[in-house]
């Protein structure tokens, strides 16, 4: 059963009463909220995501609530609760969707240490995952979104979830938060129905959430093997540049973009070393989105990659000293 199989009134009632259970990638979420503005947005943007039986178990138990008190009289706000605990300040209520998406990112960042987590966009084609670690503002979300609507499978625009035991990337296809100048760029490339409401004055400027293609959501149980590691940067008006990196450089750049490399200890080092050892990365800067996508179409091999092991790392960097 999917979100679209519920009527909007039934979805709103379920969210108000006992909440709904749903799945995104490997995670199950229990969401409760009485905010009337959220059900219509979720019904449309989450239409292809799977609903789960309400058996009480979920990885994340989430509530979005309007706080009470003197401030509520002059400014309407919303608070994100995980297991009935609040860990950060409330958001303006008009950007409740952004808080839900950001809060779920926080939940994964804090708890999903069964994976090596890298701040990266990930798309897949022909069995190969293209991992694109990048700092905020690099344009990775826009590049991921454009590739996803050009026939690539979106695994995530935010998290590369790497399984240490086999180096596969676990899909976590979420709404893609398009920001500021990227919004009109993607409006020209995707159906309007896939775009969420315009959310002004967020911490990152104006945001519009883009729903992943149906195929990416439907195949969210299919892991992918790494095929290339790119560190992308959008440089408006500048020529495309592809500059290969050595294994040590790739290792250092990956660790700089990892959420939990140090937290998971030796397992993190071995997994990161194996990634850098098998797939040395490259700097990738581009000033034209169409040119970048055309280049990437020809970058990955057409055959599915072999399965490497963490033990078979090739020549990798030594454990860095502290």
Regions found by a protein language model. Name each.
Residues 63-107:
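Charged, amphipathic alpha-helical linker segments immediately N-terminal to NTP-binding catalytic cores
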Residues 97-133:
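P-loop NTPase catalytic core of nucleic-acid-dependent motor ATPases
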Residues 140:
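Conserved lysine of the Walker
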Residues 143-144:
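Post-Walker A alpha-helix
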């Amino acid at each position: 059963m999917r979100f679209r199989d519920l009527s909007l009134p039934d979805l709103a009632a379920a969210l108000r009463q006992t909440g709904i259970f749903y799945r995104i990638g490997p995670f199950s979420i229990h969401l409760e909220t009485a905010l009337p503005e959220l059900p219509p947005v979720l019904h449309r943007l989450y239409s292809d995501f799977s609903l789960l039986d309400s058996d009480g178990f979920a990885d994340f138990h989430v509530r979005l609530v309007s706080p009470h008190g003197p401030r509520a009289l002059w400014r309407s706000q919303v608070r994100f609760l995980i297991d009935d605990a609040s860990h950060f300040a409330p958001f303006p209520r008009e950007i409740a969707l952004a808080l839900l998406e950001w809060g779920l990112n926080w939940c994964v960042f804090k708890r999903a240490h069964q994976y090596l987590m890298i701040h990266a966009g990930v798309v897949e084609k022909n069995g190969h995952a293209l991992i694109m670690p990048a700092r905020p503002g690099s344009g990775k979300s826009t590049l991921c979104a454009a590739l996803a609507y050009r026939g690539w499978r979106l695994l995530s625009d935010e998290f590369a979830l790497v399984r240490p035991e086999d180096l596969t990337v676990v899909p976590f296809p979420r709404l893609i938060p398009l920001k500021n100048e990227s919004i009109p760029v993607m409006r020209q490339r995707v159906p309007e129905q896939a775009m969420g409401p315009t959310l002004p004055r967020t911490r990152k400027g104006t945001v519009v959430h883009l729903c992943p293609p149906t195929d990416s959501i439907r195949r969210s149980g299919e892991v992918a093997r790494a095929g290339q590691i790119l560190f992308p940067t959008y440089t408006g008006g500048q020529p495309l540049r592809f500059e290969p990196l050595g294994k040590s450089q790739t290792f250092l750049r990956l660790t700089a973009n990892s959420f939990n490399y140090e937290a998971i200890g030796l397992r993190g080092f071995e997994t990161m070393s194996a990634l850098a050892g098998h797939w040395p990365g490259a700097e990738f800067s581009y000033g034209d989105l169409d040119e970048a996508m055309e280049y990437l179409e020809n970058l990955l091999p057409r055959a599915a990659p072999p399965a490497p092991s963490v033990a078979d790392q090739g020549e990798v960097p030594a454990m860095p000293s502290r």
